[in-house]
Amino acid sequence: MAAWGRRRLGPGGGGSRERVSLSATDCYIVHEIYSGENAQDQFEYELEQALEAQYKYIVIEPTRIGDETARWITVGNCLHKTAVLAGTACLFTPLALPLDYSHYISLPAGVLSLACCTLYGISWQFDPCCKYQVEYDAYKLSRLPLHTLTSSTPVVLVRKDDLHRKRLHNTIALAALVYCVKKVYELYAV
């Protein structure tokens, strides 16, 4: 594997990549072991316990629950990005377009940003799954004990701090709300 080879560093660097062992508190594996008719419920319970225990890495072997979790995280990411991009469009459109026409783009973009931020806040903000992202980096995946798995396509979640991300989309959505209220007041009150 290429991930096991030497890493090229800039001038003066000569380090090599080594396989880093993870402690038991870093990684949790939801194994795909069907031991009864309620196996799916057991997988979901194990995943929920792992999320609440805040493991750095969670490996999900069962395909169905892994795919559902990855989709849930993807939808949350989409809402976050839409809130940020629509809010940014709302705030910067008046700078790029004539003032007479900018509200045709900035007001709907502001409403979209606020709607996505609100939906994220209601549905995702307090879900322990929102603290995780799906890991695709081959080098980081090579550090995990994936050789012990029975599934060939596990979903790997990595815990990431989302405080700055939440602050960003909340701040932009709030600024978009303030702009929209100001613009609606100017359009209809004056």
Curated annotation (Swiss-Prot):
GO terms for biological process: mitochondrion organization. The keyword Glycosyltransferase does not apply. InterPro entries: TMEM11. Keywords: Membrane, Mitochondrion, Mitochondrion inner membrane, Transmembrane, Transmembrane helix. Its main location: mitochondrion. Disulfide bonds: none annotated. Pfam families: Mito_morph_reg. It is a multi-pass membrane protein. It is found in: Mitochondrion inner membrane. The chain crosses the membrane at residues 84-100, 107-124. GO terms for cellular component: mitochondrial inner membrane; mitochondrion. Associates with the mitochondrial contact site and cristae organizing system (MICOS) complex, composed of at least MICOS10/MIC10, CHCHD3/MIC19, CHCHD6/MIC25, APOOL/MIC27, IMMT/MIC60, APOO/MIC23/MIC26 and QIL1/MIC13. This complex was also known under the names MINOS or MitOS complex. The MICOS complex associates with mitochondrial outer membrane proteins SAMM50, MTX1, MTX2 and DNAJC11, mitochondrial inner membrane protein TMEM11 and with HSPA9. Interacts with IMMT/MIC60. Belongs to the TMEM11 family. Plays a role in mitochondrial morphogenesis. This is Transmembrane protein 11, mitochondrial. It comes from Mus musculus (Mouse).
